[in-house]
Amino acid sequence: MGSVAVEETIVTGMAGRYAQALFSLAKESGTIDQVASDLQRLREIYRESEDLQRFIGSPAFSSEIQVKVLNALLNKVEITGLAANFIKLVAFKRRLFGLPKMIDDFNHLRDVEYGIVRATVTSAAPLKDEQLETLKGVLAAQGGGKSVEIAAKVDPALIGGLIVQLGSRMVDGSLKTKLNAIRTRMKEVG
């Protein structure tokens, strides 16, 4: 597969600044995992609720209303401490529209801190646990010895082989792509 460069992108923009501030506080207080867990729970609620998505994305609500509604939601789902205070601050500052990106950036900073690289592996059929573990080892070696977390996807249209995405790099070893390349070459020839 050749050497795969793993990038440790620095978070940028408004969402990056908020995420960096939250991450620094979480690291200082030793609560990185708790904050990550709380943010993940909020993200799941956000994904499942179109009403919450509209509420967070709408400038029609005052910051006071957003803080009150989010405070009630956070209490109901038992998100407390640093994560809850952060979310309420974001609402107060009228930056809720950027919350999903802030969560992504926080998770990226956490991964960098813990030496975790995320990979997506797409195959034509589900991979066995042993295959995933072997792939983790290969990707860890390619990624400079970092721990690799794999998100496995299945796409029967690939016919066979794998597509591996590690950071911004992608290696497409699928049979579908190889057959398409052969088809293209045959059209060029004849």
Swiss-Prot record:
Pfam families: OSCP
Cellular compartment(s): Cell inner membrane
A GO CC term attached to the entry: proton-transporting ATP synthase complex
Sorted UniProt keywords: ATP synthesis, Cell inner membrane, Cell membrane, CF(1), Hydrogen ion transport, Ion transport, Membrane, Transport
GO molecular function annotations of the record: proton-transporting ATP synthase activity, rotational mechanism
Membrane topology: Peripheral membrane protein
SUPFAM superfamilies reported in the protein's UniProt record: N-terminal domain of the delta subunit of the F1F0-ATP synthase (SSF47928)
HAMAP family linked: ATP_synth_delta_bact
Function: F(1)F(0) ATP synthase produces ATP from ADP in the presence of a proton or sodium gradient. F-type ATPases consist of two structural domains, F(1) containing the extramembraneous catalytic core and F(0) containing the membrane proton channel, linked together by a central stalk and a peripheral stalk. During catalysis, ATP synthesis in the catalytic domain of F(1) is coupled via a rotary mechanism of the central stalk subunits to proton translocation. This protein is part of the stalk that links CF(0) to CF(1). It either transmits conformational changes from CF(0) to CF(1) or is implicated in proton conduction.
Subunit (UniProt): F-type ATPases have 2 components, F(1) - the catalytic core - and F(0) - the membrane proton channel. F(1) has five subunits: alpha(3), beta(3), gamma(1), delta(1), epsilon(1). F(0) has three main subunits: a(1), b(2) and c(10-14). The alpha and beta chains form an alternating ring which encloses part of the gamma chain. F(1) is attached to F(0) by a central stalk formed by the gamma and epsilon chains, while a peripheral stalk is formed by the delta and b chains.
Homology family: Belongs to the ATPase delta chain family.
Protein's recorded name: ATP synthase subunit delta
Organism: Beijerinckia indica subsp. indica (strain ATCC 9039 / DSM 1715 / NCIMB 8712)
Gene designation: atpH
